[in-house]
């Protein structure tokens, strides 16, 4: 394979920039930059970098990793230089004379091809790079540790063991009896239950990776946009005394106790003859249906007026709040028509911490990490696991063992696609195409 290079840190002024080279000719960079000092593997060496005229480009820390003891499994050289636009441009220009620029995710792709990471760990690297909150990072790091790979490899090995028994029965049909068939059926049923339990996770891993949706609902002028802007810590929604100002749902990303929350401001819900407002209300209700959680608002001064349409939105996913409670002194929950409401006032900063704590409690209850069974974190993983389950469920042990064997061989192949034991170009393009250049 060609020797590749790329800037691994973002473009821009910084204290340090890291430029990585990977491939069998990586050490040629030492000669090209006039590095005379002995570069010991896995040791940080301070040295000047020279251009072809003998002029110093920069003073750098050079680290050399000899294959296979590197991230990619190949010889790797890293230049830790000053994060100057000029310095970076000069070094990359020099490297372009002897090496090939890396494509997006090409370093990680080589790590995969050299068996340094499986596909689930490669996906975790992308997720860690893209993580914006503590819990997103923790989920990615947990996956990078290999918990998903170990789980899927264990299931795959179970299928291989069952398949081996069936292949033996094909070669020695006299060994096939009711006890042997019952044992295979027992093993397949246990594996089926494990796969079903794993898939029945309410998509927690994907939702945590992408963001947890919390929709704000209420009648017009109940303070939805004011609360939305306060939580977002910037003015996104227009706040007006005129009802019906908000039409299209607005989104903002916030961090609540390390969880990625996407809050959504929506149109006020009421009876309306305005077709544009009706469409906004329709979209608000649709956002409510698809949300992970809902904040249902009633103005404090209207707490004794039963609003059937607003009350009908309350369910076990809801946090109920009484807005505009500016003069309240007791922040305890207030009963309103059999529901408990939190009094808040954005203007007086009353009850906001209580609201955030309730959001935290609800999110932690649904998204806390399980120590025994890790979450699926991508649609790609889910698809192959579901395909594996479908194949196992279709196995008919009353059919000839040759047919059963072929079905199980397909299931082994499908599970192998999750970790990359079996892969094709489309799968690799899908996974590594999400990386930035330099990773």
UniProtKB/Swiss-Prot annotation:
GO terms for biological process: tRNA methylation; tRNA wobble uridine modification. Mg(2+) binds at residues 225, 246. The gene is mnmE. InterPro entries: G_TrmE (IPR031168), GTP-bd (IPR006073), GTP-bd_TrmE_N (IPR018948), GTPase_MnmE (IPR004520), MnmE_dom2 (IPR027368), MnmE_helical (IPR025867), P-loop_NTPase (IPR027417), Small_GTP-bd (IPR005225). It comes from Ehrlichia chaffeensis (strain ATCC CRL-10679 / Arkansas). Homodimer. Heterotetramer of two MnmE and two MnmG subunits. Exhibits a very high intrinsic GTPase hydrolysis rate. Involved in the addition of a carboxymethylaminomethyl (cmnm) group at the wobble position (U34) of certain tRNAs, forming tRNA-cmnm(5)s(2)U34. This is tRNA modification GTPase MnmE. Belongs to the TRAFAC class TrmE-Era-EngA-EngB-Septin-like GTPase superfamily. TrmE GTPase family. GTP binds at residues 221-226, 240-246, 265-268. Keywords: Cytoplasm, GTP-binding, Hydrolase, Magnesium, Metal-binding, Nucleotide-binding, Potassium, tRNA processing. One of its GO terms (cellular component) is cytoplasm. (6S)-5-formyl-5,6,7,8-tetrahydrofolate binds at residues 20, 78, 116, 439. Its EC number is 3.6.-.-.
């Amino acid at each position: 394979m060609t020797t590749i290079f790329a800037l691994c840190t973002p473009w821009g002024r910084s204290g340090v920039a890291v430029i990585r080279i990977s491939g069998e000719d990586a050490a040629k960079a030492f000669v090209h930059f006039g590095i005379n000092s002995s570069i010991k593997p896995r040791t940080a060496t301070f040295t000047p970098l020279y251009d072809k005229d003998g002029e110093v480009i920069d003073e750098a820390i050079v680290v050399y990793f000899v294959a296979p003891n590197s991230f990619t499994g190949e010889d790797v050289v890293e230049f830790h230089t000053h994060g100057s636009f000029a310095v970076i441009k000069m070094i990359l220009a020099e490297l372009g004379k002897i090496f090939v620029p890396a494509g997006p995710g090409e370093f990680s792709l080589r790590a995969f091809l050299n068996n340094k990471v499986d596909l689930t760990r490669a996906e975790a690297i992308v997720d860690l790079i893209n993580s914006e909150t503590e819990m997103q990072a923790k989920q990615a790091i947990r996956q990078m540790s290999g918990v998903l790979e170990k789980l899927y490899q264990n299931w795959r090995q179970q299928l291989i063991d069952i398949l081996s028994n069936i292949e033996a029965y094909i070669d020695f049909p006299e060994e096939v009896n009711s006890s042997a068939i019952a044992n295979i059926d027992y093993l397949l049923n246990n594996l089926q239950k494990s796969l079903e339990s794993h898939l029945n996770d309410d998509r927690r891993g994907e939702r945590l990776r992408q963001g947890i949706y919390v929709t704000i609902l209420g009648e017009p002028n109940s303070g939805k946009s004011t609360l939305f802007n306060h939580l977002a810590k910037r003015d996104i929604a227009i706040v007006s005394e005129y009802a019906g100002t908000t039409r299209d749902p607005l989104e903002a990303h916030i961090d609540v106790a390390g969880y990625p929350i996407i809050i959504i401001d929506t149109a006020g819900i009421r009876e309306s003859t305005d077709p544009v407002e009706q469409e906004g209300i329709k979209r608000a209700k649709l956002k409510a249906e698809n949300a992970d959680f809902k904040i249902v608002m009633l103005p404090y001064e209207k707490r004794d007026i039963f609003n059937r349409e607003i009350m009908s939105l309350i369910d076990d996913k809801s946090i109920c709040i009484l807005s505009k409670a500016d003069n309240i002194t007791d922040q305890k929950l207030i009963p309103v028509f059999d529901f408990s409401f939190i009094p808040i006032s954005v203007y007086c900063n009353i009850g906001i911490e209580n609201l955030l704590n309730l959001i935290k409690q609800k999110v932690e209850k649904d998204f806390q990490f399980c120590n025994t069974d890790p979450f699926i974190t991508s649609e790609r993983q889910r698809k192959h696991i579901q395909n594996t389950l479908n194949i196992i469920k279709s196995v008919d042990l009353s059919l000839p063992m040759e047919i059963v064997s072929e079905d199980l061989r397909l299931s082994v192949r499908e599970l192998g696609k999750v970790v990359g034991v079996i892969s094709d170009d489309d799968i690799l393009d899908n996974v590594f195409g999400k990386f930035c250049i330099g990773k």
